[in-house]
Amino acid sequence: MASSLKKLISSFLLVLYSTTIIVASSESRCRRFTSIISFGDSIADTGNILHLSDVNHLPQTAFFPYGESFFHPPSGRASDGRLIIDFIAEFLGLPYVPPYFGSQNVSFEQGINFAVYGATALDRAYFVAKGIESDFTNVSLGVQLDIFKQILPNLCASSSRDCREMLGDSLILMGEIGGNDFFYPSSEGKSINETKLQDLIIKAISSAIVDLIALGGKTFLVPGGFPAGCSAACLTQYQNATEEDYDPLTGCIPRLNELGEHDNEQLKTELKRLQKLYPDVNIIYADYHNSLYRFYQEPAKYGFKNKPLAACCGVGGKYNFTIGKECGYEGVSYCQNPSEYVNWDGYHLTEAAYQKMAEGILNGPYATPAFDWSCLGSGTVDT
């Protein structure tokens, strides 16, 4: 009897211990971030594309009305104002993260942003080998990471603090990245194995995280993709779809959103695997999909117009979007109240949408695990 009781108690303690470990590993630990290091594409690009472009062939984001709600002279951001990364910086009390390209004095204190408009998760060689040669940037996620590794010794040499410690105190924003990997083949009408491509994208993101952990990275915010089936650009591309293809509530195309959600689930699975391998690291998934999708479901609740699919800046068609006549081109108009719009230019969102998304990620249900801000002396986010 005593032996059976002893076994029962031992089993109970083992279950209790295992449960404790699982709970602990699913919670983020509070950290006072001293900088933001960013990788990705146009969703986080704070101006790199401007400095990488030929002065005679500047991108649309170099022209008015980009930046008209906040920065005024266009900063290269693909919006009328601030991006999610900007609202994160504001909340943390940090400077807006400057673009790496074109910066004179790069430092951990300022933060560093390698994200580039049009960037892909996979290297350019992958697409060229498949006959996809769109006019897109060569600064893939791998290239961005290589540049960071090259400049890291110089960054650390300018400070008395340990290099690993400085990176450990940084919030590393890994994306969003991967959407362009699907967009470029689609825009050229190329057939691709979507499952295989998504596997390669996730592998590239995972590999980058592991490399940064080896360098001292401790906290990663890894966003999933947007609901592409609600994008004005995608809706215009699929405008010949039948009525049954659309969600009667939102007007989005569920099939496209479901594909994106499947990809996001795969990414989350990989992040959970990494979290188990590196229990001392915080890997936080940012649910960009659902953080944005709620605006299409209940636009008025969040302060948007009742028809949230149309672009604020654009011309023509049901969604105020025409390929070849996008925002920033001569003769293309923009709305006078961008804060009431979700979509800015057909591809990207307004500052108002990005702000509400940032709030939902920093202090809402759209980060897994949720951020712990207890060491900041505040339990709520005010962006």
Swiss-Prot record:
GO CC entries: extracellular region
Protein localization: Secreted
Presence of keyword Repressor: no
Protein name: GDSL esterase/lipase At1g28660
EC number: 3.1.1.-
Segment forming the signal sequence: 1-24
Active-site residue list: 42, 345, 348
InterPro entries linked: GDSL, SGNH_hydro_sf, SGNH_plant_lipase-like
GO molecular function: hydrolase activity, acting on ester bonds
Bridged cysteine pairs (disulfide): none
Record-linked Pfam families: Lipase_GDSL
Species annotation: Arabidopsis thaliana (Mouse-ear cress)
GO biological process terms on file: lipid catabolic process
Gene3D superfamilies documented for this protein: SGNH hydrolase
Glycosylated residues, chain numbering: 105, 138, 193, 240, 320
Keywords annotated in UniProt: Glycoprotein, Hydrolase, Lipid degradation, Lipid metabolism, Secreted, Signal
The family this protein is said to belong to: Belongs to the 'GDSL' lipolytic enzyme family.
